[in-house]
């Protein structure tokens, strides 16, 4: 199945954030490496830049929003799970036009692609809790329907 430009952007953002979390490389350095990555030409570059730079810029605030939904400190999560949760939290708070279920489904797919064997289940559980806090009207409408 062909990946959408938005999915490709999220995958590249995950790779870039993984690199940033491990090396604390400068965003410009990560951008340069991503431009040479497989699939960059098919990505929604605006979305990629928005997510990657938004998460890096707001990392501390996003981590603070995620933490109450975790069963351990965020720095004890694998870098992949942390990157995926940061991306999804950024989208839940800033990409209001994207339905929360789409954001969660995309995050689960990213965790399946890049994470450990059961990491996607953890990501799904955390984001279900987080969506109720960050998108209360939307989640209530869906659950009440």
From Swiss-Prot:
Top-level taxon in the UniProt lineage: Bacteria
GO MF assignments: RNA binding
Residues annotated as signal peptide: none
Keywords recorded for this protein, A-Z: RNA-binding, Transcription, Transcription antitermination, Transcription regulation
Keyword Transcription attached: yes
Gene Ontology cellular component annotations, sorted alphabetically: cytosol
BP GO terms, sorted: DNA-templated transcription termination; transcription antitermination
Record-linked HAMAP family: NusB (MF_00073)
Protein name: Transcription antitermination protein NusB
Gene: nusB
